[in-house]
Amino acid sequence: MAPWTLWRCCQRVVGWVPVLFITFVVVWSYYAYVVELCVSTISRTGEKGKTVVYLVAFHLFFVMFVWSYWMTIFTSPASPSKEFYLSNSEKERYEKEFSQERQQDILRRAARDLPIYTTSASKAIRYCEKCQLIKPDRAHHCSACDRCVLKMDHHCPWVNNCVGFTNYKFFMLFLLYSLLYCLFVAATVLEYFIKFWTLCRRKSTENCPKNEPTVLNFPSAKFHVLFLFFVSAMFFVSVLSLFSYHCWLVGKNRTTIESFRAPMFSYGIDGNGFSLGCSKNWRQVFGDEKKYWLVPIFSSLGDGCSFPARLVGMDPEQASVANQSDYVRSIGSNQPFPIKPLSESKNRLLDSESQWLENGAEEGVTKSGTNNHVTVEIEN
């Protein structure tokens, strides 16, 4: 076995360690809460009604948490469609050229009919040498997955997967339900945690008040109640900050990568280039049908290869002024931004500036056509 192949195999094995750790914590929390707290402790104190309510609510949060976590892990990140790959002749000419300028000319001709509006910081076509494809807007190459991922947000070690277009909604729901799960566990365990410290801080259970429904009456629950509260509180605080940050990103229609390195458009760098207004930004991730918002079912809008941009239909000079003054905030809430299919997309970014002057802003009108579809793969 080649050293590189062996290294990749080791990486894949080690990548599952954080997932196994989370799985162990979740399984232990289930046992500690259901068996040690509810069955062995609360039910024996005569509080049958409380036990039933706690168990029903707990299993609701638990199922939604595990479901969203599973979908985040096993939903395969989408890669660019075949339109973004160079043809054999284009690839051969590109590899034979040593001049970067001529290579860019080849890429510009290949990308003329693609819905690409962003470039690299040096105004070059974003091309992936490893995957040998022209990167769609917001797509990036993940070194851990060794592939280009559509609308890549980040590679998350806790799910051993890339978070991108196909599973970003699942990732958000995973954060939400893990937050609610930890909050519920911490809040319901707190009562018995306090009794443990205030009523029975003595050397043996024989000295504890016999009429108190305290966890020390059941020695096996002491360890679990103590650590269950600490673990749930700790995870709640850490997940809360991460969830708040990603809510802010969704509201701004940015990825984690774009928050650190704003995309480059024809009119310059614009961190809000894909922002259509808070409401539309949220619907891009969660979809138009509210009944699916809280369910780990794919409902995101678009095809992952092309995204509506707020200034794309404007003259470059006007766009530059609008970008500086942030004058287009109202666009997001009032005007539609349809996504054009790849077969009928007109690439304004890669055309010459003279075409802007000839065609004017009317080039921004979207043609009708068949839609591209993204297939969400679930790996078993």
UniProtKB/Swiss-Prot annotation:
Transmembrane parts of this sequence: 15-35, 54-74, 170-190, 223-246
Modifications after synthesis and translation: Autopalmitoylated (in vitro).
Protein residues bound to Zn(2+) 2: 142, 145, 155, 162
Major localization listed first in the record, in broad terms: Golgi
Catalytic activity: L-cysteinyl-[protein] + hexadecanoyl-CoA = S-hexadecanoyl-L-cysteinyl-[protein] + CoA; L-cysteinyl-[protein] + tetradecanoyl-CoA = S-tetradecanoyl-L-cysteinyl-[protein] + CoA; L-cysteinyl-[protein] + octadecanoyl-CoA = S-octadecanoyl-L-cysteinyl-[protein] + CoA
Record's comment describing the protein's domains: The DHHC domain is required for palmitoyltransferase activity.
UniProt protein name: Palmitoyltransferase ZDHHC20
Higher taxonomy: Eukaryota, Metazoa, Chordata, Craniata, Vertebrata
Site (Important for selectivity toward medium-length fatty acids): 29, 181
Intervals, Cytoplasmic compartment: 1-14, 75-169, 247-380
Enzyme Commission number(s) of this protein: 2.3.1.225, 2.3.1.-
